[in-house]
From Swiss-Prot:
GO annotation terms (biological process): translation
Entry's localization field: Plastid, Chloroplast
Pfam families xref list: Ribosomal_S14
Lineage: Eukaryota, Viridiplantae, Streptophyta, Chlorokybophyceae, Chlorokybales
Originating species: Chlorokybus atmophyticus
A cellular-component GO term for this protein: chloroplast
Main location: plastid
UniProt-listed NCBIfam families: PRK08881.1
Family per similarity comment: Belongs to the universal ribosomal protein uS14 family.
Keywords annotated in UniProt: Chloroplast, Plastid, Ribonucleoprotein, Ribosomal protein, RNA-binding, rRNA-binding
Molecular function terms, GO-annotated: rRNA binding; structural constituent of ribosome
Descriptive protein name: Small ribosomal subunit protein uS14c
Length: 100
């Protein structure tokens, strides 16, 4: 189980990303359309002044149940440990153990 503080920190990052997503998109579009180098520099500085955690690259997928950041299955939103336990307990519809 991940520490509560790490899970809360990740939630805070998700809120920041959502809050600044539109502004980041606008600044990047202006940078793309800018003609002069000075204008691009000013827009780049504007982008750099935004909070660091508002960038989507700082997000990390976490298991919805345990909060584990590694071995994450995107299709289910679970870590491999929780996925395995839930599959064995028939809590995931349509998931069967393979054998050949």
């Amino acid at each position: 189980m991940a520490k509560k503080s790490m899970i809360e920190r990740e939630k805070k990052r998700q809120k920041l990303v959502a809050k600044y997503a539109e502004l980041r998109k606008e600044i990047k579009e202006q940078m793309r359309l800018a003609s002069s180098f000075e204008e691009k520099l000013n827009l780049h500085r504007k982008l750099q002044r935004l909070p660091r955690n508002s960038s989507s690259t700082r997000l990390h997928n976490r298991c919805a149940i345990s909060g584990r950041p590694k071995a994450y299955y995107r299709d289910f939103g679970l870590s491999r440990h929780v996925f395995r336990e839930m599959a064995h307990n028939c809590l995931l519809p349509g998931v069967t153990k393979s054998s050949w």
